[in-house]
Amino acid sequence: MKVNLHVPFVNIFGKEISHNSKIQMMDEEVCNILFSGTFLRPGKTLEEESKQKMDAYLLCMKIAKAAGEVDLTVEEAAMVKMAAASLNPGGYGQVYNLIEGGE
């Protein structure tokens, strides 16, 4: 599925969210979470954990290089939603809706 994550987060009133005078973009925030791996849960084995980390890294690089529309597999879209779950509800909802085609 093709998804453009290079869009700004907006607040409850529809205004773009900025931090230190910089607009917060979904792709940048998602990439930061994927790169840090803070959303990952411990695997049953070291091999599983290593695979999760590598998958997150590769997805981070794919989104960062796209700087716009990116073609995601079902598994990659699921990982983006899992990573976005560490955001506040407003941020998560916007990422989720973008991927799932909601409002």
Spell out what each predicted region is:
Residues M1-E103:
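Positively charged, low-complexity terminal tracts
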